[in-house]
């Protein structure tokens, strides 16, 4: 079950740019607000398009959510995550971007805190 919303002019699950300028590098920004309850925003930039996976992990490293798993174009993107069914605690969100041939283009992980 996916409990994420990628804001878009397209259907739920599509991508949207939050800035018209093109990024100069790949990046995963800190979610905001942080701590959050229960919705937070995760922004990320893709220097080039690719298969983009974003997942949420608990403190023990167990994957608790897959937020995104689709090909996105280069640009600046954001996703809103609703963690209403998860207990309070520290979580990690991770992005992995792969190229056309499956090669790793970018990966990063950041910490977030859910406080209910």
Residue ranges and their predicted role:
Residues 66, 74, 80, 84, ...:
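C-terminal tail/sorting-segment detector
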Residues 1-19:
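Short, compositionally biased serine/threonine- and acidic-rich segments at solvent-exposed termini, linkers
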Residues 1-4, 41, 111:
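Ordered hydrophobic segments in well-structured contexts
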Residues 15-32, 36-56, 73, 78-81, ...:
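Glycine-centered coil/turn sites that cap beta-strands in beta-rich domains
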């Amino acid at each position: 079950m996916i409990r994420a919303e990628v804001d878009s002019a397209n259907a739920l699950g599509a991508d949207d740019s939050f800035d018209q300028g093109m990024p100069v590098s790949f990046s995963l920004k800190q979610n905001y607000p942080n701590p959050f309850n229960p919705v937070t925003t995760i922004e990320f930039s893709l220097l080039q398009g690719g298969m983009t996976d974003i997942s949420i992990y608990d403190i023990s490293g167990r994957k608790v959510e897959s937020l995104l798993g689709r090909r996105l174009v280069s640009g600046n993107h954001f996703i809103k995550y609703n963690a209403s069914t998860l207990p309070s605690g520290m979580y990690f969100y991770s992005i992995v971007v792969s190229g056309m041939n499956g090669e790793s283009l970018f990966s990063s992980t950041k910490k977030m805190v859910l406080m209910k």
